[in-house]
Amino acid sequence: MDNNEELEIVHTPVMLKEVLSFIPENAKIAVDATLGEGGHTKAMLDLNLEVHSFERDSAILEIAKKRLKNYDKFHYYNNTYDKMIEELDDSIIGNVDFMLYDLGVSLFHFKKAERGFSFKDNVRLDMRLGLNEKSAYDVINGYSEEELERVLRDYGEISNARKMANVIVKERNRRKIETSRELENIIFHNTDKSQRYGKIHPATLVFQAIRIEVNDELNILEKSISNIPSILKQNGVVVVMSYHSLEDRIIKKFFKENEKTKNKDGIFKLLNNKVKLPTNEEIKSNPASRSAKMRIAQKV
């Protein structure tokens, strides 16, 4: 894939209007925890905000840099978003007006076939979002049966995690599982026939679980959100969009535990009692938004 092709793969920013509506009046500094191709960051730069954006994947960062090269107030960091405290200048920490987390995996990663994120492509198992050494191949072919069961159960919420882990180990003992298509076939043919053709492909949650393990996604998320109170200024706002229940549970728990109410001290005022969802119109025009859940909190 050449650079021209890469620049054509532009992820439509999810719930953009809603995101921008929560930026405080007279805001000056924003942090985009999940830059991707830069759609949300660009919109904030267009509002004349100084934006500090994090992206762990150097390939997609290059796309965003080219797209945003004419913005003087764009600052980027090629790192995971749990490293904000280490990366941001001391003059920024505690003075941020607005923070955004868009936790969805970018369209770029599914389109860039050599990563093996999609079981629709017959490519080597990889699934790395950044420079981490462990790949999906290493997890599938190197983890013990017990470790595989844990990953499938905890990160895929797969009811037959033990059976599926056992099947994977038996198959890899015959020969290494090299590609996404091989793994998909193993899962499909070891799923009950009654469940093979449901709304969700039987491999979907397995691939999700492996991807989360490879990239340590939930641990990084928990560490990062714990730093939000230190990074935001008073009355600053954070918006988090999640795309599966594991992420949303972490966000909901963190906000609830740190919510200020009449009966307890806390750090945040919750700006929405129920999660905000994309409109039907957005889902039609941008199907990738369909599972998005938005939570918003203000530091008090």
Swiss-Prot record:
Signal peptide span: none
Catalytic activity: cytidine(1402) in 16S rRNA + S-adenosyl-L-methionine = N(4)-methylcytidine(1402) in 16S rRNA + S-adenosyl-L-homocysteine + H(+)
Cellular localisation: Cytoplasm
MF-aspect GO terms: rRNA (cytosine-N4-)-methyltransferase activity
Pfam assignment, any one: Methyltransf_5
Cellular component, GO, one term: cytoplasm
Claim: Iron-sulfur is one of the keywords in the record: no
Domain of life: Bacteria
Main location: cytoplasm
Annotated binding of S-adenosyl-L-methionine, by residue: 38-40, 55, 85, 102, 109
SUPFAM superfamilies, A to Z: Putative methyltransferase TM0872, insert domain, S-adenosyl-L-methionine-dependent methyltransferases
Keywords carried by this UniProt record: Cytoplasm, Methyltransferase, rRNA processing, S-adenosyl-L-methionine, Transferase
UniProt-listed Enzyme Commission number(s): 2.1.1.199
GO terms classed as biological process: rRNA base methylation
UniProt family annotation: Belongs to the methyltransferase superfamily. RsmH family.
Function: Specifically methylates the N4 position of cytidine in position 1402 (C1402) of 16S rRNA.
Protein name: Ribosomal RNA small subunit methyltransferase H
Gene this protein is translated from: rsmH
